[in-house]
Amino acid sequence: MASGKFITFEGIDGAGKTTHLQWFCERLQGRLAAAGRQVVVTREPGGTQLGEKLREILLNQPMDLETEALLMFAARREHLALVIEPALARGDWVVSDRFTDATFAYQGGGRGLPRDKLETLERWVQGGFQPDLTVLFDVAPQVASERRGAVRMPDKFESESDAFFSRTRAEYLRRAEEAPHRFAIVDATRSIPEIRQQLERVLAAL
């Protein structure tokens, strides 16, 4: 575990990924400490001063579908340039709550934006750069909806229908099927202790 790696957490809203991210990062940091490496914890959209401003807009303001995708990738370019790439160059590890798979799942699968348009933006913004590992928290939209209903006021995406999240989930699973070497799928319907057991296996494989 000496060289820097980029890990992403993905899943539909209500899958529980954010609940487990800090625990995962603390466990990972414990394993990296002896090598003098740090774990940089970040998120998308966001992670930078500009990215957080764009996040506030993206999560709360209605907008044209293509504008939404363009702003997502604009925030991502800033995130890569200011946070992710410098951290990896130092040999640190980066764990991000969402990355490009979320754009394909939400703007592509959920919103219906053509995949070729997203692929064009992906090539422009990140070239061939991809996460070393993507942990996908998979859960049925109905279960995720019940979880979302038990928390704070929902943002624009959290307020979407089960049908939207069914399309989003399907796109996540399709991407996982296309890149099985990169994805680790977590059964997010399980209890917190059971999910953490799954994450322990993910950590052991790093």
UniProtKB/Swiss-Prot annotation:
In alphabetical order, the GO MF annotations are: ATP binding; dTMP kinase activity
**Which reaction is the catalytic activity of this chain?**
dTMP + ATP = dTDP + ADP
Q: State the family it belongs to.
A: Belongs to the thymidylate kinase family.
Q: Does the keyword Cell inner membrane apply?
A: no
Q: What is this protein called?
A: Thymidylate kinase
Query: What residues does ATP bind to?
Result: G11, I12, D13, G14, A15, G16, K17, T18
Q: Which cellular components does GO assign to this protein?
A: cytosol
Q: Which organism is it from?
A: Burkholderia cenocepacia (strain HI2424)
In terms of HAMAP family, this protein maps to:
Thymidylate_kinase
| Alphabetized InterPro entries for the sequence | P-loop_NTPase, Thymidylate_kin-like_dom, Thymidylate_kinase
The UniProt record lists the EC number as 2.7.4.9
